[in-house]
Each structure stands twice: as structure tokens, then as C-alpha cells.
Amino acid sequence: NFYKLYPEKFNNKTNGITFRRWLLHSNPELTDFITGFIGDGFKKDAEELKKLDTPVITKNLKQLYRLLDIKAQKKAELAKYLEETQGITINPDSIFDIQIKRLHEYKRQQMNALYLIHKYLEIKKGKKPTTPITAIFGAKAAPAYIIAKDIIHMILCLQQIIDKDPEVKPYLNVVMVNNYNVTLAEKLIPACDISEQISLASKEASGTGNMKFMLNGAVTLGTDDGANVEIHELVGD
């Protein structure tokens, strides 16, 4: 075991993201909200965001409701965009549970889909969620990665089944967006309520999607792996 011999040679190298694209450009409303509290220093120095963690801000209900208004606005914008560009109809008042990333077995989109099948069967039994859920997937598979393509096929089949089931549709919606890319991610990330970061523990070196979602106010649902570990340490439970 090389770690026992040279523990100092084994350490993490965290990736990073650019605020210019994933906050300033993607979510100008949230940018203005933050600037109103702490100025614009955070645009060049992420450490400035720590100034938000003060009782004056965290216990200000009026401002916290403003955050909810911004999130609702971005969700409505996403719903309109998907309707106009892809013909996909989603409920902007539902919980947006989003998993967008490269399609790979270790990233476990298939596990997310299996949970949604379980949720579908629960609703059929009469166990309806108190708040509707919209599960959104965005991914592309490598050309020769057959299993990844099969997972996409499974998600699309689930989407079609739910779309044709009037008993389930009001409570659960599954969407696989077409041609997932950066432009679409700029719409999806600010609208997200729950960020799915469920890669198999020990397989994710860092990840950056988790950072983009966290920056835009989503709650992370994830394994204790990659940059999720550092996010957990900073944000807590």
C-alpha cells in the first residue's frame, strides 16, 4: 500500500468554476441580490462570499423570501424555454430535481431512474407526494458506450410512460432534455432546487457541477466524494 509508505504524496486537487459564466451571466438576479449585501468583490474573490454568513442576512426573512422569488423566476424562465424550444411542458411550481452531467455508470443516472420508477409505483398505490416533483436529466453518452445509451433509452421510456399516465403526471414528471450542452446548463442550473451528485463514492475526483448548483442556491443531494466533501465541510448539513 503506497499510501502507508508515502502518505504526503496522496492529496486532493479540487477543480474550479468561473463565476463569470455560472453566476454573473447565468443568474444576474442573484448576482444583484448578493451585490446589494456585500458589494461586488465576490466577482473576483470567492472568499468574499463568506460575508453572507452573518445573522443580519441569514435571519432577515424579507431577504430570504426574495431569494425564493429569484428561484421561482428562474424556474418559470426554464419552463418557458423548454416549452418554446423543445416542446417539453413542466410545472414551475414543482420541485426541480436535476441531474445533468456526462452519462456514465459510476455517475449513477440509472440509480436515479430506478428511484423514480419506485416513486411512480408508490404514486400508483396512492402514496402521492405533497409537492409535485420534476426530475430533469441532461446527458450525452460516448459514441461506443452502449450501456450509457441504454440508460438514456430507459429514462426516455420512463418519461413517455409518465406522460401518458394522468394518474401520475400531476405528481411526478421525468424529463430528458434534448442536446444537453453549456447553453442549456446555463438555464437549468439557476432553476434547480435539488442537485443530484450521486456518483459512486471513490470514483469522482472532484466534479464541478456540484459547485455550479451550490453557487446558485440549490440543495446538494450527494455521496461523500469529490468536491462534495469540501462543500459539506463548508456548508454543513
What are these regions (language model features)?
Residues 20, 24, 64-68, 106, ...:
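Hydrophobic alpha-helical scaffolding
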Residues 72-185:
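Long, K/E/R/D-enriched contiguous segments that form extended
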Residues 23-89, 93:
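Extended, charge-enriched "interface" segments that sit outside catalytic cores
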Residues 170-171, 193-196:
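Short, basic, glycine/proline-bearing loop/turn elements
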Residues 6-9, 14-54, 190-191, 198-237:
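Catalytic binding pocket for nucleotide-activated donors in carbohydrate/polymer assembly enzymes
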